[in-house]
UniProtKB/Swiss-Prot annotation:
It comes from the Bacteria. It is a single-pass membrane protein. It holds the Pfam family YceG. Belongs to the transglycosylase MltG family. The chain crosses the membrane at residues 16-36. The keyword Transmembrane helix applies. GO terms for molecular function: lytic endotransglycosylase activity. Disulfide bonds: none annotated. Its EC number is 4.2.2.29. This is Endolytic murein transglycosylase. It catalyses: a peptidoglycan chain = a peptidoglycan chain with N-acetyl-1,6-anhydromuramyl-[peptide] at the reducing end + a peptidoglycan chain with N-acetylglucosamine at the non-reducing end. Its main location: membrane.
């Protein structure tokens, strides 16, 4: 009887061990199949084209987010891990025609090979003003710069944009003191067009649509910070125009916000140049007397609207300024920016880093 009990106990243990092994294999197998499924197309036989824009300088995580948002991949994490596993690199910025029937290998191959072909493309650079963008459009299309500016300033067309992009184009653009209603609203990117006869309206809408996509992305943060799209674009444009390649935009943003809180004029030179309507290598003291609502030496607060477009780094800085006590900054000849807290410190920095011939 004791022997039978031992045998029974042995077989029970064996059964438990075997069951555990089976369960373990099922778990491992299930995990493997699930992981494998994440690498497969979203819709295996789909031919649906999805137009994707990869901004310049996008990280793998940012690319994954864009692909997932457009329902081209199943999982951001799976895409990131697979890219790392494959050792893939050299993703190129631009517009791509992808489809939901592509697996991760096909998508990666596409993004590393370069953007899809097009009939023409228009490149809008960061910090470009509306008149410069109009010239860029004119260079690549049948429309003259004058025609482009007229369309960009056309109230009827802008009202159409308001209806199509109500979260982005608002009544703020109709401020009577604004030079160009859509200044700052044409997002910096490269825009390829497949149809050589693309209408001027559609070209402009493509740029507004791109801005609108980022407005949607940052909507909750703007609401949290109690800042409108117009104010965000305005602040971002000031940061963009002041920043050098080596500048800490978040610190520049902190200077502007600190001065606004103290009701000090922003005193930023690019606004004077915008008011004058021309670019100069340096701003003279007489330029500071220009009578314009855009002159931040004569007026407190923000300018009536943006003075240029701005890239994402300036958007980020406008939304997330550093917490500092800085009220002044200046750029050294090598592009580095010196931040100071008092006028006395600022003047010392000017004496140290800026030669007399380059001063106002």
């Amino acid at each position: 009887m004791y022997i039978n009990q031992q045998k029974k106990s042995f077989f029970n243990k064996k059964r438990i061990i075997l069951s555990s092994i089976v369960v373990l294999f099922l778990i491992i197998g299930g995990a493997f199949l699930y992981g494998k499924s994440l690498l497969e197309p979203v819709e295996k036989d789909s031919k649906t084209t999805v137009n994707i824009n990869i901004p310049s300088g996008s990280s793998v995580s940012a690319i994954a987010s864009i692909l997932k948002k457009n329902d081209v991949i199943k999982s951001e994490k799976a895409f990131q891990y697979y890219v790392k596993y494959k050792g893939a690199s050299g993703f190129q910025a631009g517009f791509y025609h992808l489809n939901k029937g592509m697996d991760l290998d096909a998508i990666i191959q596409k993004l590393t090979s370069g953007a899809t072909g097009y009939a023409f493309q228009i490149t809008v650079t960061e910090g470009a003003q509306l008149t410069q963008i109009a010239a860029a459009i004119a260079d690549e299309t049948k429309y003259s710069k004058k025609q482009v500016i007229a369309k960009l300033d056309d109230e009827t067309f802008i009202n159409q944009l308001k209806k199509e992009f109500p979260d982005t184009v608002t009544n703020d653009v109709f401020n009577k003191n604004i030079k160009h209603p859509l200044e700052g609203y044409l997002f910096p990117a490269t825009y390829p067009f497949n149809d050589p006869d693309t209408s001027l309206e559609d070209i402009i809408k493509a740029m507004i649509k791109q801005t609108n996509s980022y407005v949607e992305t940052y909507k909750s943060e703007m609401k949290k910070n109690k800042v409108s799209v117009h104010k965000l674009l305005t602040m971002a444009s000031l940061i963009e125009e002041e920043a050098t390649e080596k500048a800490d935009r978040h610190k520049i943003a902190s200077v502007f916000y600190n001065r606004l809180k103290k009701k000090m004029p922003l005193q930023t030179d690019p606004t004077v140049l915008y008011a004058a309507g021309k670019h100069k290598d340096r701003v003279l003291y007489k330029d500071l007397e220009i009578d314009s609502p855009y002159n931040t030496y004569k007026n407190t607060g923000l300018t009536p609207g943006p003075i240029a477009n701005a890239g994402m780094s300036s958007w980020e800085a406008a939304l997330h300024p550093d917490k500092t006590d800085y009220l002044y900054f200046l750029a050294k000849s090598n592009g580095e920016v010196v931040f100071t807290k008092t006028l006395k410190e600022h003047n010392k920095a000017k004496e140290k880093y800026i030669s007399s011939k380059n001063e106002k």
